[in-house]
């Protein structure tokens, strides 16, 4: 999980991780189109983690190409807040991980 801190503040991760179910309901009204339950944080970790593993395999030439279909999505999440059904931006987390840990210098992100 340290790779999340390349992209997000401790406060943001803490907000998503440590809220109880009653607070999740309150947060749903604070953020745009975010629905939460007791498994939301763990699901978001798996989503970002799967993309990290995929990108690591590409960078290390273990695979030649890839296509990731990941749920829950992440492309609407802001750098400091959940938004649009997304808690964390999976692509930002994975790319920042590769830049910090695998010495990747450049990336191209296409989101349509």
Q: Language-model segments: which ranges?
A:
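HDAC/HDAC-like amidohydrolase catalytic core signature
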Residues: 1-112
């Amino acid at each position: 999980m340290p790779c999340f801190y390349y992209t997000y503040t401790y406060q943001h991760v803490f907000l998503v991780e440590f809220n109880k179910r009653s607070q999740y309901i309150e947060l749903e009204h604070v953020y745009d189109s975010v629905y939460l339950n007791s498994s939301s944080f763990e699901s978001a970790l798996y989503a970002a983690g799967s993309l990290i593993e995929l990108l690591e395999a590409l960078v290390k030439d273990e695979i030649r190409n890839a296509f990731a279909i990941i749920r829950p999505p992440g492309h609407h999440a802001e750098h400091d807040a959940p938004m649009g059904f997304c808690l964390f931006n999976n692509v930002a987390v994975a790319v920042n991980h590769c830049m910090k840990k695998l010495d990747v210098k450049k990336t191209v992100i296409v989101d349509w």
